[in-house]
Amino acid sequence: MKHDIKIENKSLEMMISEKGYISKLSMKDDPYKMNWVIEEAYLSQAGYQDADKLFGYFDITADSKQRNSREFSPVIEKEGAEITVTYDFGNMKIIMIYDMGKNDGELHWTIHLVNQEKKDIWISDFGVWISFAYVMFRDKEVLRNIHNSAAVFSSISDNYTKLNAVRRDNRGGNLGFYQVEGEALSIGTYCDYENLFFENVSPSLDGMLFHKLYFAGGYPEGFQNKDWIYKKDGFMLKAEEDRTWKYVVNINRNQEEFLEKGLKLNHPKVDYTPLNIIGETARLTVEVSESLKILSAEALFKENDTVKSLSIEVKYEGEMYHLSYKPTALGEHKAVIKFSDGTKDFVVMNVMDKLDRVIDERVAYICDELYEGKEGNPPFAFKPVSNQGESLGKLNLVLKKNLLGSLDVDQVRKVEKSAVEYVRPKWFKDGDFKKPRKLYGDFYRCMDFEYIGHLFYLLSEFDDQILELYTADTYLEWAADVFELRVNPDLHEDERGKEESQMLGVYFLYFEDLLIKLKEKELTEKMQTIQSLWDKMMDRVHRGADSYAAAITEHFYDNAGFGPAAGALSVSKKRESAEKYGELLLANIGYSNDFRAQNPDRWWEALSYMTHSLWGGLTAAAAYKVFSYLQNTEFLEGSYRATAGVLYCYDTHATAVTPLKKGMAVSTYAVAGPHINRPDLSRDRFGQAAFYRDGGIFARLFDSDDQTPDWDMGEEMTAYLDSFGQKTFIINNKGTLRVINGSYEETETGYKITSFAPYSRDFYYISEDGMTLLERQGDGRSVVLQIRR
C-alpha cells in the first residue's frame, strides 16, 4: 500500500498523494490544524464528485488533443525537502517541483511544460487546479467554517499574478501565493454545491469553489465575450522548448503583510482609487523594490468599440511613484505600468458618470419601466415579481432618492400605491401584520419582513401632502408592527418562524431611525416593545459571540449573517463582540488589482466568486457601521472597496461586460474568468435567472431565463445613500493624503477635495489625532484644506 509523501520546513508541511495532487498543506503552529487545500476525503464524505479538481491536477489541449493528469500515474521522486511529480505524454512532459528547502518558511512550486519533439506544438488550453480550501462545510459547527476555510482574493497580472488565501477568522494566518516567473492569463473557478432551500431545512446550502490557474485559453473554441481586459490566447511551444512558471507560497497575517512580502519577491505594491468620476483626477501610487524602475504608464479604455490609450503622468517622490491622469471616457480603465526589466503590471479602475445622475436614471427606470400599475398582473407591483422580500428593495431606493435628492411626487405615490395595494395583501392575510402568508408552500420567510418594515418606515418620512392613501403616522405604525413580527419569536407558531425571527438581518440599517421616530411621535408602547426585543436579541448575540452563531443563516456560513451581526453590535455599542464579528467582515471583503474583484466574498447566486449587488452592498454597509463605532479605518477602506464593485452593477457605461440600457441594473457580476460551470457568464453581469436553463433549484426559483436581472436590488443602494452617498473621508497618514470617496487637486497652500457622493453633505478629516467633521464650504461638494504638503 502506497502512502502520501511528506516534505516540510520550520513553518509549513505538505503531502503529495500517490496520484500526484497535494493532499495536505498546513501551517505547523496552527492550533486549528487547517488543511489549506480541498480534501478528497471531504468530497467523498459530502457526496461531491470532484476528485478530478484537486490541487496540482491539470488539463491541457495540445494540437487539438485534450490530455489531463488523471490519464497516467505520475512518477513521483523525493530528494530532501523537494518532491518532483512527472507526467510523460510522449510528445510532451509536465514536471511539477515542490520545494520546501529553498527558503525556510516558504513553498516554491515550479511547473515545467517540455516539448519532447523537434516540431512546434500549439497549446490552446492549459490550466492547473490550485484548489485552496475555499469551502462552505456542511457542518452546523460554524467554527469549522471560520477556522478551517479560506476566501481567495486574486490579482491577475502579466508578470505579477498573486492571490491571498485568507482564513475566514482573519486571525489565524493566511497563505500568499505569488508568481515569480512566467505569465499567467487568469484564474477561473468551478462551483459545486447542494441547495435544499425548498425542502424546508435550515441551513440548506453548502458548497465550494475550485480555483484553476490558466496559462493558455480557458474557454471553448471560438468563444467571445465583451471582456477586452484579460487575455484568452494560446501559445506555441517551440520544438524542444522547456517553458517554466514559478510560484512562491508563504504565510502572512493580513493584507499589508501580504503586499509587503510580495514586495520582497519583486512584486510592485500598487494602491489605486477603485472608483473615479469622469472629469476628476484618478491616482495611483506604486512602491517597487530597488531593482525596478517605472519606465512609463498608460491607461487603456474602450470607446466606440475601439481600445484607446491615454498617457499617465509619473512622478517619483517620497520613496514611491505617484501616477495621475484625468480620464476622458466612461467605463473600465486598465492602467498598465511598464518596468525597467521588461515586465508589466496593471490595475483595473472604473470611471463612472456623476453618481446623482446614475441614481436619478435608475429610479426613473424603476418607476417608468418596472411599475405595473392598475392593469398589471398583479396590479401595482414592480417587476420582476417575486415572493422574496429582497424584490422590494427597489421601492426603498425610489423613496430614499426622493428624500435626499430631487422630489418627484409621482414616483413616491407609485411606491405608496404598491406598498398598500400589492405588498400588504400579498405578504399578510387580510392585511393583518400578525398573519403572514405562507408564500413558500408550507412556510414563510421572516427575512422578507425587514424589507417591508423599511418600506413603511421610509413612507413615514414624507409629509402628508405628498402621500395620498394614508398618513405618515399610519405608515410609521405599520413599520413598527412589521418590525415586531420580524424580531418577536412569540408571534410565530412554527419552529422555523421562531428560529428565523431571532436571526439578524438588514433591519440593523434602520432600527435606530425607527426608534427615534417612534419616540418623536410619542408611540411609547411600540417603541418600548421594539427596544426590548432588540435589547434581548443583542444581549443574546453578544453573549454567544465566541460561538459565532449569527454567522449561520439559511446557509452554513453567510455574510448575510455575520455582516448584520457586526453592524448591529456596533449600533448597540457592544465593543468586544463587534470586534469579533468585525474580523469576519475584514476577512470577507476582497482586495485585488481589479476593482471588480474586491467584493465581499460570496458565490451562490453566481456559482462563482462574485460581486452580489445586494449582499455586497449590505456587507459594505455593515463594515461602515463597524467603522463608525470602532473608528478603525480598515473597515472604512473595506467598505469603500466593496461599494465600488456594487456600483458597477448599476453602471450603464461599462465596456467590458454585456451592455445595459440607461437606468437598468444587474444583480451579479461573476469575477472569475473563466466561469467553468457556465463559460458564457465569465467576467460578466447577469441575474440569477440566467441559471434557469440549467434546471434544478433555479427552475423552481424562476419562471424563465429572460426575467429582468435586478429582482433583488435596491436595498443596498438605500444603505449606500446613508453612508458614502453623503460622506467623504480624507486620511492624512504621516503627511500622505488619501481620499475615500473623492479626489483631490493640489493648491498653492494645500488641497482641494472634491466628493464623489451623489448628495454630498459631510467631509471628515482623519489623522493621528482622530476624526474631525470639517466645516461645510459652499455647496458642500468640495472643501479646501490648508495643510502643508
Regions found by a protein language model. Give the residues of each.
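Short Pro-Gly-centered flexible turn/kink motifs
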Residues: F235-R253, L774-I787
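Low-complexity, acidic Ser/Thr/Pro/Gly-rich terminal tails and inter-domain linkers that flank the onset
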Residues: I83-N103, R253-T273
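Terminal, non-catalytic domain-edge segments
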Residues: E256-N276, S532, K536, R540, ...
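Low-complexity, Pro/Ser/Thr- and charge-rich linker/hinge segments at domain boundaries
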Residues: M136-K140, K261, N266-T281, K344-F380
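Acidic (Asp/Glu-rich), glycine- and aromatic
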Residues: D88-M92, G101-K162, T343
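Extended acidic/polar, glycine-enriched regions
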Residues: E290-V358
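Catalytic cores of extracellular degradative/oxidative enzymes
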Residues: K354-Y624
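Acidic-aromatic substrate-binding/catalytic surfaces of carbohydrate-active enzymes
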Residues: K2-T86, M136-D139, L143, H147-F153, ...
